[in-house]
Amino acid sequence: MEPDVSIETLSIIRIAVLPIGTIPPTLLRDYHSMLLRHHTIALSAISSFYTEHQKSPFTNQPWDSGSLRFKFVLGGSPPSPWEDFQSNRKMLAVIGLCHCPSSPDLDSVTEKFNVACKSYSSALVRRCFAFSPGDSQLEDGDKKGENLILFPPSDKQTQEFHLQTMMQDIAASLLMEFEKWVLQAESAGTILKTPLDSQASLNSEEVIKAKKRRLGRAQKTIGDYSLLAGSPVDANAHYSTALELARLTGDYFWYAGALEGSVCALLVDRMGQRDVALEDEVRYRYTNVILHYRKSFIQEIAQRVSPLSFELEATLKLARFLCRRELAKEVVELLTNAADGAKSLIDASDRLILYVEVARLFGALGYQRKAAFFCRQVAQLYLQQDNRLAAISAMQVLSMTTDAYRIQSRASMSKVSVNNETGRLPDAGKMHHHSIVSLFESHWSTLQMVVLREILLSAVRAGDPLAAWSAAARLLRWHYPLITPSGQNGLANSLANSADRLPSGTRCADPALPFVRLFSFPLHSSQVDIVKRNPAREDWWTGSAPSGPFIYTPFSKGDANESSKQELIWVVGEPVQVLVELANPCCFDLRIDSIYLSAHSSNFDAFPVSVDIPPNSAKVITLSGIPTAVGPVTIPGCTVHCFGVITEHVFRDVDNLLLGAAQGLVFSDPFRSCGSAKLRHVFVPNISVAPPLPLLVANVVGGDGAIILYEGEIREVCINFANAGTVPIVQAHVSLSGKNQDAVISIADEALQSALPLKPGAQVTLPVTLKAWHVGPTDSDNTMSSGRNAAGNTGRPKDGTSPSLLIHYAGPLSNNGDSQEKESIVPPGRRLVVPLQICVLQGLSFVKARLLSMEIPAHVSDNLRDEDIERESNADSLVKINPFRGSWGLRFLELELSNPTDVVFEISVFVQLENSAKEDDSSPVQDSPEYEYPKTRIDRDYSARVLIPLEHFKLPVLDGSFFTKDPPPGSPSSSRNPSFSEKNTKAEINTLIKNLISKIKVRWQSGRNSSGELDIKDAIQTALQTTVMDVLLPDPLTFGFRLVRNGLEKDPETKAESPFSKGSVLSHEVTPMEVLVRNNTSEAIKLNLSVTCRDVAGQNCTEGADATVLWAGALSGISMEVAPLQEARHCFSLFFLVPGEYTMVAAAVIEDANNVLRARAGTASPNEPIFCRGPPFHVCVAGGAL
């Protein structure tokens, strides 16, 4: 059998192409490719070379449309024993190829060519083409005869034209030789034999039969030459005669041959005119051809020679003619019959050729798996031969089956598929189901393993270590679950042995172990966060920070690609990191010599690392690199140097594998089998590289640990900033973010601004003043326990509670000063987030707070004018005399504090003093605006009370607006707005309370460096809630006493020397006095006044027989009316009989009290009298002259 046969093969002239002398392989391929372009020579093109010596036997030669067809057999082939049966099997011409510079002796070339031609006795034309001859060779070439054709050095186009001319000459010579042979065969006849003819002596009957068959065989052979000469009509005429003679003589074998020739003549005659009728005719005739080949089977010589190969060859020719998808069923039946007949073939080479042709035809039909099956049969026949060339052939044939079995090497994939794998398409993040199914089909695993083992075996025999490594890698990577531990170790040894025979640094397209998947592309840390920069805005950082929490809306619709694809910016010269996970699901220790990121761009340098992975385990590693130039970067996978070979592991392949495992398309997930957790699909972001940027690095002076503060503690923290980049910082802005931003009291931003531009390597220190916030009740237990660490406070800040410093900074708009580049490309800015890791421990805790009151009686003295009060220093009047009551009213805020910590606190109370414009400039209060009370010490685990004195504030008037209650919602007055006076009064109350609270500060100190301030606002507010009326609202009536010194000089010097200047009273003298009654309301009050004088024992001194004080005037039953906000006086005189301490008390009963007075007094009945009593006034009576 012959390979690549078709029905038209009978019309093709075979020409042996032989290299003569030494020819470089590349030149030989070039010369051969030049010949292949002239496989068809039109008859019209050879008319100038054709000479008709006598009348041509090809009377129907189609000179206008006919052609001669050639098949160039490089290296020739041995003669076939079936050449007489089919003339196209003969080598009818020989062409020698010579390279003159390599073979300068043309005589030797001619001799070698003649010797080579002796092996082809059937050759009718012989030519030797000598290329690139020298000048001397050109002179000698003319003497060597017409068989040596010299091709002088020239351009390729000229050489091709020269070669075309020579091929036309060869075609004309062959045509003339065909005519000679046909004329001789018709006149003299010829003896034509095949191996089927008996070689034994023939009896007379067989001799007669042979003579009769000779004529029919001659006609068949003439028909073959007519067909080779391009005259299908003449060939068909001779074939018809041969068919008739062969049928009469029972020569079935030659009958089948003649019938085959007639079909070929029919197709050549109707070239390009294929239709259904033609197909039916060919099908019918070839069915007869196959039938007659089968009839020519001779049992006696079946063990030696058999026409079965021609029968199967005819079946293949018909199958090739009908091979298209519409007739697939018929073609498959023909091929199946041919494959079944292969078992009866005697020659193994015929069986090999048959399987090859069957595989080709199945592949042409699109039946790849059937084609792969017969390719494996071919490989088995090759592997039965124990030689290297057969192993190479087996390996090449098996490599053709890998596509059908889905085990193809990545090197054999088309460039288009590779681009689709690694290209950045809009749907590059998606994985399609059909692609996964095509890559992984678990029910074929056993067959895939067998094929890969056969490829591995053939590669080892062929001495191809790279192919052996590739096969072992694919077998181990994709089928490790089905391979025993010993088999896995064997494959690892095969990989190592193949690598030993390969040069160092060899790359293979097929990865082995480990399995590599993308774990994550870490986004920028807070140290290197990049912000887009708008050069048109000075505050380009505005809006760069997140404005609020993420809110999920299930009704929002968006593009999946837009949401899943991330944008990642790297910076030239700054190291970057990518996390990948490696899995070794096999039973041996895996040593990875190096692994690094694979970048399909020239602007990224990756850093290799070596890894050891134990058996059946996975490991997450960090791979790093440095971008080197601006532009996009693609990271499709990793480059791994393992088992002595460098391979590329693509993330997409492992993603498809894991998805296939999830859908049951592959046996096992290598990562799950190694104990790794299930990882969601990680999309590869779009990575771009920005130009060099400044890099600001921050660290807290004294350590980057948590800043431990007690509640209210104030501390200054210094943060050191350094420019670790290669570009200076020319712009910087500091802001705050996060919770508890009030904890940052001040930031010395001017220190940073003054250091700009901050050059590479330069540093600047930024002081930040912090104040610890109040720990909530939910955190009290945690802070209590953390505060117990006295020896070394190692408290941890609660996540999300500490504020952070945001530093937005940027370099110059252009690194090289190019204005065009400045306009087109603006380097981005950066945001540095410095978390202030503040751990607030509970310090002093409030137990309770209450308001205490105390009154100190005032001394009765001369007229108590305002200037007398103002004359006293502020330090002495921290607790002022109430001008409306005439005595000292004190309020104390008592705070009970507990110390649950392990440190000692000292508490100091500071009260802010009021600076009056009337004070003397030399007053010491000017230099000390705060008055400090003595310190209070609170030991650990103890409590203490701190008294904070409060001024007895009073409003100037008692008005009804203080007692106005909110009307019910349904009442008509509920819709009215409060009056302006009511709003004013309430606002005044709130202002006074806030003013009171703001004047008092409670500060603590612990040790040398720890100090702070307690937040007592809530405590004072709580304490004042129930007593706000008592503290702020004045009494309706206030009383006061004073001495009346009629005729006393008003001169200050005289007054200073008077014994009454300090309010002293002498006994046995009449002492004029007056009582002052002030109305603090906005309406007139009628009252009944009474005055009482008591001694130190509390007894009334003006009544009874034992009275010690005589009086003149009225002391009781005094009726008077006091105008609104005015004072009324009542004068009387006292005569003290006994020196000593006396107390004066005034009281009054208000007549016809209104609602405001009753609300202030809190009376329940409208008839109940309202009694007002004033505070006591002391009178110091000294002994006087009798």
Curated annotation (Swiss-Prot):
Its main location: Golgi. Keywords: Endosome, Golgi apparatus, Phosphoprotein, Transport. The keyword S-adenosyl-L-methionine does not apply. It comes from the Eukaryota. It holds the Pfam family TRAPPC9-Trs120. The lineage of its organism: Eukaryota, Viridiplantae, Streptophyta, Embryophyta, Tracheophyta. Part of the multisubunit TRAPP (transport protein particle) II complex composed of BET3, BET5, TRS20, TRS23, TRS31, TRS33, TRS65, TRS85, TRS120 and TRS130. Residues 779-792 have a biased composition (Polar residues). Residues 777-824, 964-984 are annotated as: Disordered. It comes from Arabidopsis thaliana (Mouse-ear cress). The modification Phosphoserine is found at residue 971. GO terms for biological process: cell plate assembly; cytokinesis by cell plate formation. This is Trafficking protein particle complex II-specific subunit 120 homolog. It is found in: Golgi apparatus, trans-Golgi network; Early endosome. Disruption phenotype: Cytokinesis-defective and seedling-lethal phenotype. The gene is TRS120. One of its GO terms (cellular component) is early endosome. Specific subunit of the TRAPP II complex, a highly conserved vesicle tethering complex that is required for the proper transport of proteins in post-Golgi trafficking pathways to the growing cell plate in mitotic active cells. Required for the polarized and selective transport of PIN2 and probably PIN1 to the plasma membrane. Not required for ER-to-Golgi as well as biosynthetic and endocytic vacuolar transport. Belongs to the TRS120 family. Residues 972-981 have a biased composition (Low complexity).
